[in-house]
Amino acid sequence: MPEPDSPFGELIRNQEMREKLTVIKVGGKIVEEEATLLQLLNDFAAISGHKVLVHGGGRSATKIAAQLGIESKMVNGRRITDAETLKVVTMVYGGLVNKNIVAGLQARGVNALGLTGADMNVIRSVKRPVKEVDYGFVGDVEKVDASLLADLIHKGVVPVMAPLTHDGQGNMLNTNADTIAGETAKALSALFDVTLVLSLIH
């Protein structure tokens, strides 16, 4: 406890009073393999208190793109997202992977809600400018609506966030899941005592 005359006493007390929130990011390998997905669902459901889950899905996107005859191009571990690839990642990240996680969490008593950045304008991004590499339809996060997420969280909803954002002009953007987790945690840290956990398995 702070000393009564400490100049930081009120700040420290406010920190102690803030609700705790855990933001967890998991990579594609975890959510795309049945055994690790089941373990994730069980472990995440067991975490008490407010929480947010951010997921990847790159392996599934690569697999389905290949089945559709669309070549996946990577530079420095980042996906080049042309118009056709954007369709694939939107379907895979925002649909297949996200909804499988949401359904699994609902089965475990977690009131999960799947979101992309376009849903309720929760995360807006700007298309990454072309420098040495043209990454295509890849977004750099501009704003996370922390108030909206906090409202959902306080209503008992657990956001499950796909690695997709939008530019506010009708365009979806492929966005790095680590970045989404970090920016979400940063925005929510104004309202909660946030712990950010980034999985090292991609």
Language-model-detected regions and their locations in the chain:
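Short, C-terminally biased terminal segments at protein or domain edges
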Residues: P2-P4
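N-terminal glycine-/serine-/threonine-rich phosphate-binding loop
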Residues: P7-L53
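Structural motif
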Residues: L21-K25, V52-V54, V158-A162, V197-S199
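Charged helix-capping and loop-helix junction motifs
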Residues: L37-L41, N174-G182
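Glycine/small-residue-rich interface belts in oligomeric ring/scaffold proteins
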Residues: G49, L53-V75
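Ligand-binding beta-strand-loop-alpha-helix segment within the catalytic cores
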Residues: A66, I70-V160
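Glycine- and Gly-Pro-enriched alpha-helical subdomains that act as flexible
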Residues: A181, S189-L191
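Conserved small/polar residues in nucleotide/adenosyl-binding loops
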Residues: H202
